[in-house]
Amino acid sequence: MKTTSEIRQSFLDFFHSKGHTVVPSSSLVPENDPTLLFTNAGMNQFKDVFLGLEKRPYTRATTAQRCVRAGGKHNDLENVGYTARHHTFFEMMGNFSFGDYFKHDAIQFGWEYLTSPQWLGLPKEKLYVTVYETDDEAYDIWNKIVGVPTDHIIRIGDNKGAPYASDNFWAMGDTGPCGPCTEIFYDHGETFWGGLPGSPEEDGDRYIEVWNIVFMQFNRLADGTMEKLPKPSVDTGMGLERMTAVMQHVNSNYETDIFQTLIKEVAGLLNVSDLDNKSLRVVADHIRACSYLIADGVVPSNEGRGYVLRRIIRRAVRHGNLLGAKEAFFYKLVPTLATVMGHAGEVLTQKQAHIQKTLKAEEEQFARTLERGLALLEDALTKVENNTLSGEVAFKLYDTYGFPLDLTADVCRERELTIDEAGFEAEMTAQRERAKASSNFGTDYNNVIKVEGQTDFIGYDNLEAQATIVGLFSNGKAVDTIQSGESAVIILDQTPFYAEMGGQVGDSGLISTEICNFTVNDTQKYGQVFGHIGQLTSGSLSIGDKVTATVHATRRIAITANHSATHLLHSALREVLGDHVAQKGSLVSENILRFDFSQPEAISKSQLEEIERIVNRKIRENIQVTIETMDIESAKKKGAMALFGEKYGDVVRVVGMTEFSIELCGGTHVQRTGDIGLFKLVSEGAVAAGIRRVEAVTAETAIEWLHNQQKVLQQSAEFLKADSNSLVEKIQQLQDKAKRTEKELQQLKDKLAAQAGSELVKQANKINGVNVVVQKLENVEVKSLRTMVDDLKNQLESAIVVFGTVADEKVNLIVGVTKDLSSKVNAGELVGAMAQQVGGKGGGRADMAMAGGSEPQNLDNALKFAEEWIQAKL
């Protein structure tokens, strides 16, 4: 029996033997396609090739592409674990022709691989094919050339309510490349329910699609017209998990070797004996998606891809909880996964430590709120009406306890309940509106500035240039002329001003003529043109005017030093912390550099010191900074780091500082690292789960920062009458003395409180034979209240004690009840009721509880209420 890894390799070997280039799987994070959340098909990495926007050095390709379908348009998450074939992560085997072969070869390649004894050797009678209803060419190839009998070929027409809307017609979008497709189905046999494709029973488990071959032969225009493409292409996809199920003679993907290994590993970790438990399937599926997403640079967060990852992890953790998990377990599956995935698991092995750290941290974080959230949900489920959980409760679980909506839906599904999703969305919308109301945005010129052509940037080597004004925009609209005093955006035909990109801020400076001065405060890119944003301080300017554009040189030099230092910092972080470090955001300004990066745990002081030492060592080495322009493939072979989420063209700019740092970058840089002068880290901390931020200063700013630190040190030493070298020792002595004094003071306060308590014993009232003390206290700290209550309870032996005090305009309440009375008078209930009287809230145990409030004027009423409440209970 062939393993999954053997089937994967045989597919690639077969198509390599047919002249195809084996192309590695692309990242799950699409590199050049903002329309996609995750890579979800083999053709994603070739999209620009099919559109004619990119050329590759080959016309035939084959891949084993890792894919994720969770979130966005293609979302299989809610079905995972409940069906035989839904997964969050899967592998799509594919072969592609870019204007090379077409239908004849594509069909015959597929049939040979599936049926030849040298390859998969499937029984021909077990295979059925579908073709688009009018695709006679494909039908004839299957029937007359391949030899598939007519009763095994099915024509499928427009079955989705519109022309060319069919299971057998594929389109990239409403316009663009499209064409008919032919699909191959495997018959699992009569023991499974289901009908042939196109029949009412087609959704059954008997006939399963294993391969889809798309013939891109048309270009659909906006009016619906179909034009023939000059070079038709082929895009195919064979689901590896489905084909493995066929080859291993099982009907469910979860019965195949990879999933069975993972399921048994989970069962062993959690001591589960029933291997058919759906939660085992969920966990086995989710560890694949989570591990590969983290390996490809995604970190759990509350936005975009990071939130989808968080949702999958939390769903897995919840199902682990159902299986009896009492501690973090999910991360322990990574080594087994890396092994069982074979060659495709190498990326997991390389990043195993990082993946496990990230998973463990996220699992432990969610575990802290999981039990409380489930308790709230269980309580809410007992009160549902019309078998529907309210959107308000679902939103509270999401907002307060971190429950993704699909996790709550999972629990409801198990109880045959639904969620009021409209109500949930209403709560989400209200929250977004509140957030939007708190923001204030100025004029957005992105949709306003429309200028033919492009701005040529000549600022790498020049800080001043002659240019022509080709566009003017003021008050949100295009104008021909601006006058003195007007704020505007000026577009030039060429410019030395750098527009904000890649984290580097835009340049400032001056645009001038002999009689006009326009102060440039910022430079931004709008499409292909650079916008110089500022104010005209004298004269007037019109479209067509010749001007001198001058960059603020001192500011540019400072920005440039910070940008080069950022590259050194990035490499130093990877050297000290590990290769998992990837840039997640940056700011390069004249005053400071800020760098956000993936890192699952806090960074120690010694690590920060080592990072700083490495950067300064590279600065002292005065390394020549090299800048080369080359094609993207050559840059990658050179080892250049591409930044997560950035889009690069075919030709890229590579900035190198020997082998220590090589990055793709369009920013400005120093000529030698010595020009940076000095590097000093000034802050480090977390900005989100799995994301840390460091800030640093360089050159003159770093020297000024050190001067200020020295000044603070000297002033502190003078104030404490100590030498700066013994300052730490002096502060430690003062701290120890302060702690002793504070302890002595607290002991005195407790003694006074005990004395006051003895006086209060004499003032105890009897209510139905029970000792009751209800008092408003003056000048008593909150810390002492509990001591006083405990002393009174001990002295009276059987009593109810209620104290109220005011400090800093806030009310503090405490209720103590001896254990013999706590079944009648619950301290938590009483203090909660009192808190409402003073505009607050609180609670606690039946024998001791505290609360606070913001309305001290109502304290007397609250104490009177307490007496009446106690009397009613007794």
UniProtKB/Swiss-Prot annotation:
One of its GO terms (molecular function) is tRNA binding. It holds the Pfam family tRNA-synt_2c. InterPro entries: aa-tRNA-synth_II/BPL/LPL, Ala-tRNA-lgiase_IIc, Ala-tRNA-ligase_IIc_anticod-bd, Ala-tRNA-synth_IIc_core, Ala-tRNA-synth_IIc_N, Ala-tRNA_ligase, Ala_tRNA_ligase_euk/bac, DHHA1_dom. One of its GO terms (biological process) is alanyl-tRNA aminoacylation. It is found in: Cytoplasm. Its cofactor is Zn(2+). Its EC number is 6.1.1.7. GO terms for cellular component: cytosol. Zn(2+) binds at residues 563, 567, 665, 669. It catalyses: tRNA(Ala) + L-alanine + ATP = L-alanyl-tRNA(Ala) + AMP + diphosphate. Keywords: Aminoacyl-tRNA synthetase, ATP-binding, Cytoplasm, Ligase, Metal-binding, Nucleotide-binding, Protein biosynthesis, RNA-binding, tRNA-binding, Zinc. Binds 1 zinc ion per subunit. NCBIfam families: alaS. PANTHER family: ALANINE--TRNA LIGASE, CYTOPLASMIC, ALANYL-TRNA SYNTHETASE. Consists of three domains; the N-terminal catalytic domain, the editing domain and the C-terminal C-Ala domain. The editing domain removes incorrectly charged amino acids, while the C-Ala domain, along with tRNA(Ala), serves as a bridge to cooperatively bring together the editing and aminoacylation centers thus stimulating deacylation of misacylated tRNAs. Catalyzes the attachment of alanine to tRNA(Ala) in a two-step reaction: alanine is first activated by ATP to form Ala-AMP and then transferred to the acceptor end of tRNA(Ala). Also edits incorrectly charged Ser-tRNA(Ala) and Gly-tRNA(Ala) via its editing domain. Belongs to the class-II aminoacyl-tRNA synthetase family. This is Alanine--tRNA ligase. It comes from Actinobacillus pleuropneumoniae serotype 3 (strain JL03).
